[in-house]
Amino acid sequence: MKIIFMGTPDYAAHILEKLLNTKNIEVVALYTQPDKPVGRKKILTPPAAKNIALKYGIAISQPSRLRDKETVAEVTSIECDYIVVAAYGQILPLEILKHAPCINLHASILPHYRGASPIQQTLLHGDVKTGVTAMLMNEGLDTGDILKIKEIEVDADEMSESLFSRLTEVASDLTIDVLENFVQYTPKIQDDSLSSHCKKITKQDGEVEFDNATAIFNKYRAFTPWPGIYLTSGLKLKKIELFEKESQNESGRILDIQKDSIIVGCKKGSIKVITLQPESKNEMSALSYINGKRLNIADTLS
């Protein structure tokens, strides 16, 4: 079967490579986002999916707007059986949706967490399970009919990188399953009354206050490595653990100093802070930081 693949980040790149190494599947073209400047030096960097396509010698297109007439004409001129979409970053116009069945791999149990940050939302909400949904795309955002859902459990202390890696493997296998057994699956309409939406993560989302220890820890799980979590002062909490969930404390008060960490109170619960990073400085142990600031038990970390 012939496939047009549309995807951009690592998640998409892994799925693309799985397709390229599967018998009876031919990826005839990749559509991905344009190269973007990255880092302080603004080095023009290709998306992860493009690197895979270059490795395997696949035709690559990087339109700024998939909706442009020229791009739509180009896509619809390519003979294919399916279009597979994974974290592409653009909405597919109706003309392309009609060209071939468009199958999207979304990293949540739809209709929960439609949108740009489903993995982070899973961790922010402390969910104990998540999954990948294969769906037939329509003109809405993650609103298409569901073909199959593969669920996995989420560990209580699992970080975003680990969950991302596991969901990527699930999505890769699910893609092959759905393509090879497409006619066996009956599309199921999503229940919009159960839907929730999630936006793109910004740097500002990483700001925390010592209100709820569980919420802080979940933000840490979701936002490591980026954007990280930090106090209003700019002090970054680089490595933390949830110490306990229920105690009531003064916000930010140092409750205990241990041999490798400090225990910081929240209005509800407390966290163990192992390393910190002040603005414009390197990461350091929490002990080194409080010693430098001459902070002790009952003082406030801020």
Curated annotation (Swiss-Prot):
It holds the Pfam family Formyl_trans_N. It comes from the Bacteria. The keyword Transferase applies. (6S)-5,6,7,8-tetrahydrofolate binds at S108, I109, L110, P111. Gene3D superfamilies: 3.40.50.12230. Belongs to the Fmt family. This is Methionyl-tRNA formyltransferase. It comes from Sulfurimonas denitrificans (strain ATCC 33889 / DSM 1251). The gene is fmt.
